[in-house]
Amino acid sequence: NVVALCADLIGSLKMDQFIKENPERFFQIGIAEANMMGIAAGLTIGGKIPFAGTFAEFATARVYDQIRQSIAYSNKNVKIAASHAGLTLGEDGATHQTLEDIGLMKMLPGMVVINPCDYNQTKAATIAAAEYEGPVYLRFGRPAVPVFTPADQKFEIGKGILMNEGTDVTIVATGHLVWESLVAAAELEK
């Protein structure tokens, strides 16, 4: 029942393999993010589990009304896959950057926000999101980060993971910045 929708970013979102293997489960919406959210909400009525993919800025601020009205308030089983989050799209300028997306999405009723830190956690989080009944905002950064979580790690929605133990400083991070926090912790240990 999983289907994918894209707002004209197949290459940037690395959707080629899914489309090749499942062309009948893919919908190219074009540069029409607001329509994509409405279509995704509608697909849930027929039992589909839509993953709507675009850049984080376009998946939140640009379409907030549609998400609020058509997805969150009605508790639709839509998964919003938002890539290139934060300042990771520097070369594309401020119009493509978002820092407020987590806050915007956390304010919505019933919306679950997931911000995985590496490939293994992203894979596990995506599976957990698909299995979860209700709206989910999956947030991904753009930078390549090393794979540092176990491949068999179970992802639990709403639960943090202790990556390192120490006695002097607590560092809290989310998403692709978890790797940077581990690097910083190693430096502080010296």
Task: Set out the residue ranges of the language-model regions.
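Thiamine diphosphate
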Residues: 1-139, 144, 154
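Glycine-/acidic-rich phosphate or pyrophosphate-binding loops and their flanking alpha/beta elements
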Residues: 1, 19, 124-135, 144-187
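Flexible, glycine/charged-enriched surface loops at secondary-structure junctions
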Residues: 190
